Regions:
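Short amphipathic
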Residues: 317-323
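Positively charged n-region of N-terminal signal peptides that target proteins for export
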Residues: 1-4
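Intrinsically disordered, low-complexity segments enriched in polar/charged small residues
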Residues: 7-9, 143-144
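Acidic (Asp/Glu)-rich catalytic clusters
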Residues: 281-285, 307-316
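Bacterial N-terminal signal peptides
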Residues: 8-20
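Divalent metal-binding segments
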Residues: 22-39, 44, 48-304, 323-374
Length: 374
């Protein structure tokens, strides 16, 4: 996931409720005294009938007036905080409709393998050097976790137009497991040590909905794992950071979402342990924004039914279920109804990608969700 610095100021209150108030709709006599009033910059309402406003008033965590400065200032009381935007833009916060907040924290704390301008990795030698530099700069963390993680490479932007391999990662370390996460998070690359830890070998069969790529002319894994093959490996490797490490990922991920203007972050396809971790952090007051988890519809239905909620408690809720049907278009595993046009890599003619769930699983999940009101 690539990000760009955002210079806008974002309201973190419940912005969707009264943005529809048009200019001049603030009451002439204050029915409520505002806690805060913003003015002094462009205010975008996202309301087609009144796209811009001069001021916004908030009371009790809710927007109570949007309109002209003269009208909104009528809600000013002796303790109202006046906030001068100084030309900055004010707009409603973004709601994450498809994200993985723990993966965001993982990205923030891992070696940055993104291509320019977000990183410096344009070929595999640069990727390997970035890993070496990160290991040297984070020796204490590597020694503690016995795990090296890099995030954000994309074979389509590498000069070689391919994924790195286990043998190349072995030049960094043969003794400490290494896990690279593709920019889409649907692929990964493991070194030989990591492959051994997760139990993948020439005898391993591809899991349903995933692929273990092999060395040419053999069944030996070359380190590249697709979709559910990678997900299974990652779930076995990441616990090496310990529960405190996973908590750090969650906190840092939520902070990243907050910095870029989100008021709701998502943890998609969460497992129950992840959902419990997020609830624990929420109960401890760790989040400044709302976090919603959607749990795997194929494996954890009883947990979903028992724990889903339409309301947030301490800024967290389990919102329902997620069903993964196919992969990622970035890695050419997304399932298409027509062949990919010039996919980057070694793919057979007419390649369509592939599903990660059967038709029976999809229809059964839909029926279950409707019956359980998920």
């Amino acid at each position: 996931m690539r990000t760009r610095t955002c210079s806008t100021l974002v309201v973190t209150a419940l912005l969707g409720t009264i943005w529809g108030c048009a200019a001049g709709n603030a009451p002439s006599a204050p029915a409520v005294i505002a806690d805060r009033i913003w003015s002094g910059g462009p205010i975008l309402t996202m309301d087609d009938t009144a796209m811009r406003a001069e001021a916004v008033a908030e009371a009790g965590g809710k927007i109570v007036a949007v309109g002209s400065k003269a009208a909104v200032m009528k809600l000013q009381g002796p303790k109202t905080e006046l906030i001068d935007l100084k030309g900055r833009t004010l707009l409603p916060g973004f709601i994450d409709a498809h994200g993985h907040v723990l993966v965001g924290g993982l990205q923030a704390l891992s070696a940055n393998l993104l291509a320019p301008p977000d990183g410096n990795v344009s070929d595999i030698p640069a990727l390997l050097q970035t890993l070496r530099d990160w290991v040297a700069a984070n020796k204490a963390a590597v020694d503690k976790t016995q795990l090296i993680i890099g995030f954000g490479y994309d074979q389509a932007t590498l000069a070689e137009h391919r994924h790195p391999t286990r043998d190349e990662l072995d030049t960094i370390s043969k003794d400490i497991p290494i896990m690279l996460v593709h920019q889409s998070a649907h692929f990964g690359v493991l070194n030989s040590k990591a492959l051994g830890i997760v139990g993948l070998s020439a005898a391993s069969k591809d899991p349903a909905g995933g692929v273990i790529r092999r060395k040419d002319g053999s069944q030996e894994p070359n380190g590249v794992l697709e979709e559910l093959a990678f997900a299974g490996a990652a779930f076995k490797l990441l616990p090496r950071v310990g529960p405190n490490g996973m908590e750090v990922f969650a906190r840092e991920g939520a902070k990243m979402w907050t910095r870029y203007g989100y008021t709701t972050a998502e943890e998609g396809k969460a497992i129950p342990d992840t959902a419990r971790l997020l609830k624990k952090l929420a109960d401890e007051g760790s989040f400044d924004i709302d976090v919603v988890a959607y749990v795997d519809a194929l494996s954890d239905r009883d947990f979903i039914v028992a724990n889903q909620s339409r309301t947030y408690t301490n800024r967290f809720r389990i919102g329902g279920a997620k069903l993964t049907i196919d992969g990622a278009l970035q890695g050419f595993t997304g399932w298409r109804d027509r062949p990919y046009y010039k996919p980057v890599g070694d793919f057979p003619p007419g390649y369509l990608g592939y599903p990660s769930a059967t038709a029976d699983q999809v229809f059964d999940s839909a029926r279950w969700a409707a019956e359980q009101k998920v």
